[in-house]
């Protein structure tokens, strides 16, 4: 009826002026208000009358719009939408006479809009996953995906998983935020450099390590890893260049190095230890926090991140990442170097070499510290140095564990620390 009624109206109107359309829109707005009032007062009869009038106007407006676009075929559609929307959606839509438009757009927007965000998140997440670099860029969304990726990588890495979950101190979204923060913070501080460097490293790391895959996963998976690990890697490299960063990062490496053997032995446990021990650097406290779980520790570290500050967080991040990464690496190495872990540092070195990405990173470190093999000792040593720096920061108790696990490294630590 409404359609039939609208068409005659349109024909009867003849010329359609903007003023007439605006007036009708105003009338529709008034009708909507009346409908809402009627609904509130429980006057269903009046409400239905207003709805019919409103629907008629909307159909008419839709017809005008369609006729202007030569899309008479769509005429039925607006009425259909208008009917429901007019009575229901429109009434609630509120004054806007365009309610129909609103409703339709709302529907489209609501339907499409949210999907878009989701898709964006997915795409972002996906992109970040695939494009670790995007992660660095997009950070949050990508981080989200990254987190997802991290979670997966972490799942793959277990430690990472813990790490991711831990990292997600915020956990899940927070993780993203934290990760974002971690990346943002660490990356913000180191991130930019790490990111840029990292990207190169990333490529190298990713390429360097088939384990890198794991590493990548750390990067990709722990895309903060990526963001930071590579940065760590970079930082390790760059930072080793910058021993401070190197120290921070290296300590993580070191713990992994130190930890790796044990990590390898019981990376998870070792994680706890490593993180407790390996994390002796500032991470120690933090790592211990993180590492107590190894995962929660991360979560804690992230909290620590904020607490420690970007530098520390970065260190922690680096350590996390590295340790996390190392953990990953360690774990990865486990996978890679399950045997090497047993072998010990050299094996670890080998493991890292196995991870070659890691050695690459070590190389990054190595350049600072020396060849991969030597790096490794250097690494531990470098870490020792850096770690020493850390160690002072960290409580002795964790250190002793490191010492125990890393009696060898500790010597280095001692040397470096000195």
UniProtKB/Swiss-Prot annotation:
Primary location group: nucleus
Region: Disordered, residue numbers: 77-118, 188-418
Compartmental location: Nucleus
Source species, domain of life: Eukaryota
Tissue: Fairly ubiquitously expressed. Expressed in synovial sarcomas and in other human cell lines. The fusion genes SSXT-SSX1 and SSXT-SSX2 are expressed only in synovial sarcomas.
Residues flagged as site, Breakpoint for translocation to form the SSXT-SSX1 fusion protein (rare): 366-367
GO molecular function: transcription coactivator activity
Biased composition (Pro residues): 394-403
Pfam families: SSXT (PF05030)
GO cellular component annotations of the record: chromatin; GBAF complex; microtubule cytoskeleton; npBAF complex; nucleoplasm; nucleus; SWI/SNF complex
Motif (SH3-binding): 392-401
Cystine crosslinks: none
Region entry Transcriptional activation, spans: 2-186
Modified residues (N-acetylserine): 2
Positions of short motif SH2-binding: 50-53, 374-377, 413-416
Region entry 2 X 13 AA imperfect tandem repeats, spans: 344-369
GO annotation (BP), single: positive regulation of cell population proliferation
Record-marked site positions (Breakpoint for translocation to form the SSXT-SSX1 or SSXT-SSX2 fusion proteins): 410-411
Biased composition (Basic and acidic residues): 309-318
Family: Belongs to the SS18 family.
Pathological association: A chromosomal aberration involving SS18 may be a cause of synovial sarcoma. Translocation t(X;18)(p11.2;q11.2). The translocation is specifically found in more than 80% of synovial sarcoma. The fusion products SSXT-SSX1 or SSXT-SSX2 are probably responsible for transforming activity. Heterogeneity in the position of the breakpoint can occur (low frequency).
Physiological role: Appears to function synergistically with RBM14 as a transcriptional coactivator. Isoform 1 and isoform 2 function in nuclear receptor coactivation. Isoform 1 and isoform 2 function in general transcriptional coactivation. Component of SWI/SNF chromatin remodeling subcomplex GBAF that carries out key enzymatic activities, changing chromatin structure by altering DNA-histone contacts within a nucleosome in an ATP-dependent manner.
Subunit organization: Interacts with MLLT10. Isoform 1 interacts with RBM14 isoform 1. Isoform 2 interacts with RBM14 isoform 1. Component of the multiprotein chromatin-remodeling complexes SWI/SNF: SWI/SNF-A (BAF), SWI/SNF-B (PBAF) and related complexes. The canonical complex contains a catalytic subunit (either SMARCA4/BRG1/BAF190A or SMARCA2/BRM/BAF190B) and at least SMARCE1, ACTL6A/BAF53, SMARCC1/BAF155, SMARCC2/BAF170, and SMARCB1/SNF5/BAF47. Other subunits specific to each of the complexes may also be present permitting several possible combinations developmentally and tissue specific.
Name of the molecule in the record: Protein SSXT
Protein's organism: Homo sapiens (Human)
Gene that this polypeptide is encoded by: SS18
């Amino acid at each position: 009826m409404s359609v039939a009624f609208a068409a005659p109206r349109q024909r009867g109107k003849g010329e359609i002026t903007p003023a007439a359309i605006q007036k009708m829109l105003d009338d529709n707005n008034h009708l909507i208000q009346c409908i809402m009032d009627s609904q509130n007062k429980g006057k269903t009869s009046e409400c239905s009358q207003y709805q019919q009038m409103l629907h008629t106007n909307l159909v008419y407006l839709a017809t005008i719009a369609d006729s202007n676009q030569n899309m008479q075929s769509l005429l039925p559609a607006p009425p259909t939408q208008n009917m429901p929307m007019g009575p229901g959606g429109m009434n609630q839509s509120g004054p806007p006479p365009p309610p129909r438009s609103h409703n339709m757009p709302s529907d489209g927007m609501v339907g499409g809009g949210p999907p878009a965000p989701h898709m964006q998140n997915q795409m972002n997440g996906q992109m970040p996953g695939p494009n670790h670099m995007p992660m660095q860029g997009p950070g949050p969304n990508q981080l989200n995906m990254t987190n997802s990726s991290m979670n997966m990588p972490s799942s793959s890495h277990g430690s990472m998983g813990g790490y991711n979950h831990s990292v997600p101190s915020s956990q899940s979204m927070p993780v993203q935020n934290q990760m974002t923060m971690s990346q943002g913070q660490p990356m913000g501080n180191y991130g930019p450099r790490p990111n840029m460097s990292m990207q190169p490293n990333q490529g190298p790391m990713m390429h360097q390590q088939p384990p890198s895959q794991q590493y990548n996963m750390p990067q990709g998976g722990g895309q903060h890893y990526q963001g930071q690990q590579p940065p760590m890697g970079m930082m390790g490299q760059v930072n080793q260049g910058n021993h401070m960063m190197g120290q921070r990062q290296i300590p993580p490496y070191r713990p992994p190095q130190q930890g790796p053997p044990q990590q390898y032995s019981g990376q998870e446990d070792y994680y706890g230890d490593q993180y407790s021990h390996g994390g002796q650097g500032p991470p120690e406290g933090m790592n211990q926090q993180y590492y107590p779980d190894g995962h929660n520790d991360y979560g804690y570290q992230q909290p620590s991140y904020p607490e420690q500050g970007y530098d520390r967080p970065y260190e922690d991040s680096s350590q996390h990442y590295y340790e996390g990464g190392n953990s990953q690496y360690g774990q990865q190495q486990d996978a890679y170097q399950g045997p090497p872990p047993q072998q010990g540092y050299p094996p670890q070195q080998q493991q890292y070499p196995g991870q070659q990405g890691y050695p690459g990173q070590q190389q990054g470190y190595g350049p600072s510290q020396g060849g991969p093999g030597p790096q490794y000792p250097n690494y531990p040593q470098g870490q020792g140095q850096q770690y020493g720096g850390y160690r002072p920061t960290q409580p002795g108790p964790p250190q002793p564990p490191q010492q125990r696990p890393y009696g060898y490294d500790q010597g280095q630590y001692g040397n470096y620390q000195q």
